[in-house]
């Protein structure tokens, strides 16, 4: 089992996947139409992004009944046939087919476990250290994410 996916390996996965996965490629292409505005708030500059294509993911139904009625798309057996991943210990790096970054990855745990950060800080640090060109982040189960029922992190390229 491969451990410690590097930034270079992740970038190659993205390139390989976009060459064969049309809908993901189209969604990455749609990033060109994203509107970005920079604001400075109390001396801190932030970028605000308007990405209408992202509504598919951000407006997904995540109520208890909807989650029961759908197959978890982060579980290996339910992923699209075209989706490949890079094993990384008990996680797998996948490209995010609904990106907000020019290089956007979802890193689910290989078992269907709840999206809880407790006991995963060490994992998060290890993943972040190995893939130094990416910022790693966690969305909690109540933040509007489309996968509140499966433990995962996300990664995106720094400085975009």
Please provide the spans of the model-predicted regions.
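Active-site microenvironments that recognize anionic phosphate/pyrophosphate groups
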Residues: 1-119, 123, 134, 138-141, ...
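Extended, Lys/Arg-enriched charged tracts that mediate electrostatic binding to polyanionic substrates
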Residues: 126
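Glycine- and acidic-residue-rich phosphate-binding/metal-coordinating active-site segment common to enzymes
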Residues: 129, 140-160
């Amino acid at each position: 089992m491969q451990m410690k996916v590097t930034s270079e390996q992740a970038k190659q996965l993205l390139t390989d996947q976009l060459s064969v996965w049309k809908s993901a490629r189209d969604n990455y292409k749609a990033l060109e139409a994203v509107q970005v505005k920079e604001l400075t708030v109390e001396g801190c500059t932030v970028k605000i992004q308007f990405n209408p294509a992202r509504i598919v993911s951000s407006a997904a139904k995540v109520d208890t009944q909807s989650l029961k009625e759908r197959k978890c798309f982060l579980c290996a057996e339910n992923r699209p046939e075209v989706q490949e991943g890079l094993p990384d210990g008990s996680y797998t790096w996948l490209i995010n087919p609904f990106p907000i970054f020019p290089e956007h990855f979802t890193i689910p745990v290989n078992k269907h476990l709840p999206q809880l950060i407790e006991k995963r800080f060490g994992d998060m640090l290890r993943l972040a250290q190995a893939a130094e060109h990416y910022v790693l982040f966690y969305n909690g189960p109540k933040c509007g994410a489309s996968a509140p029922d499966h433990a995962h992190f996300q990664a995106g390229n720094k400085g975009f």
